[in-house]
Amino acid sequence: MVHSDDGTDYTLSAQLLSYAMSIIEEAALPSSAYSLGGGTVLSYLFHHRKSKDIDLFVNDAQYMGALSPRFNEYSDRALSYNEDGNCIVLSFDEGKIDFIAATQITDYPAKMQSIFGQRIAVDDPVEIVCKKIYFRGNRAYPRDIFDLAVLYESSRRTDLITELKKYPDKVKQFADAFQKNRSDPCIEPYSTIYADSLLAGGKKFAGREFALCQMLLQELAGTA
């Protein structure tokens, strides 16, 4: 079994990452071509919410074909998959593996670390959250808002704000989606919908993520 410092079980994540590394090895990707990011890495670092799926970011779209179940023996072992030019989603009994074609967008590069039983480049938390806003901010998912609030309240607040200011159009897109969702009575905060998924580090943010996100947006707009 694989546990974080707070005792959270990441055995399923470790198994998924093991599958992913076999797929990468079969595709003969150099170690410099990919990094581990996404919500499960944030969960492991901040102990705020449960997450098990694996997100791997590939810095050159030309590698995506070699990862596809159409050409990769190990990918083909997935129960099912979805694929487009920039993303491959593989479903296993343990959860999902996403291979996403995306370059680094912040000044905080991935660093080699040991995580979930593997030695791999791991994205910086600021990079992870900025990617959420940059690539899918127009949807403002509740879990992304929760992750954003947690990082905003951490020691990385200044780093986060500095990086987000580089992408005003993406921030505006996110802000518009956030305000629309916030005014929709059918859309509730992540901490309300998935209260049972909150870990020790996330319980203090319960019911606060919308307000914290609003504070961040005001700070980015210079109105805080």
Kindly label every feature range from the protein language model.
Residues 1-224:
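Compositionally biased terminal segments of proteins
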